[in-house]
């Protein structure tokens, strides 16, 4: 395919917006300045109380490819769904309104690799922006060459490295999403993790770019970093949605047992950490939330299956093997207070930052 033919492929960029006046200019400028010009940029405003709509309207008046629409106020997942239904592009890119693209050629690189490999999803590396410092995240090269059906690919892709979990930093083939009717579920947060797991279960073909294609601004006010009392319910809702999706697509549930187990371990750890921070480092608060996970029938089944598993975990990192086995055993035997102490130690040593 020639360069001209590739430029004929349209990319739809979908951006949910809520109170993003501080960063939205930088976000839009990084997209407008892309060397790849066949774009439509759809911004869905979710009832911003600041000047975000005014700023976007000025861009909209200047750039015909920019379109702002009114959202339902139900969160980023619903906004992305609205954008997906309006999108006319051959490919989809999601971005958050407080992040930006550091490479003006990243869309060209996405398209080139997608067309060369016939990939459904092209994944780039990313970096975090934290207190004015760029911190490169763990790169996906450690699992990119693994078979997508392997435990290593799933574990690193969605958890220890985590690159596959996020909606951003990727190029999606719209036809793939449309054919499989993949949309964002109605969740309080982590809807992008479920979205990408649904893509994975539908046997998406992946291609990986070594380039850093996205800068994620770590924002303590983001939903992802805030304490939520409904968090346990949200994670179990995600798991139930995932199990329903596996059944809907006529997949063997046994193939995804470890995926669900890992998901619940990471969810329980994350919620334990948030309870610890929210309640002045109270071990009893952590114990209480771990008990919620261990008492849920689906959680108990998942932790017990991982703890009783005879086959060795097909994960290369020994530390992760030890942590997964220890956590699942602790949850199986209801050692909630002991597990709470373990979470305290990991948070104190800042190991938790690698799990976020």
Q: Where are the model-predicted features located?
A:
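Short loop->beta transition adjacent to catalytic acidic/histidine clusters or analogous donor-positioning motifs
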Residues: 8-11, 32-43, 51, 63-67
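Short, well-formed alpha-helical segments that are part of the catalytic scaffolds
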Residues: 19-33
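A conserved acidic beta->alpha catalytic loop
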Residues: 45-54, 73
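Glycine-rich, basic loop-to-helix element that forms the pyrophosphate-binding segment
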Residues: 70-87, 97
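Donor-binding/catalytic cores of nucleotide-activated saccharide
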Residues: 76, 97-209, 214-230
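Short aromatic/hydrophobic "clamp" motif used to bind/position activated sugar donors
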Residues: 92
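Catalytic core of nucleotide-sugar-dependent glycosyltransferases
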Residues: 211-220, 225-254, 259, 270, ...
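Membrane-interface aromatic/basic loop that binds lipid-linked glycans or pyrophosphate carriers
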Residues: 276-356
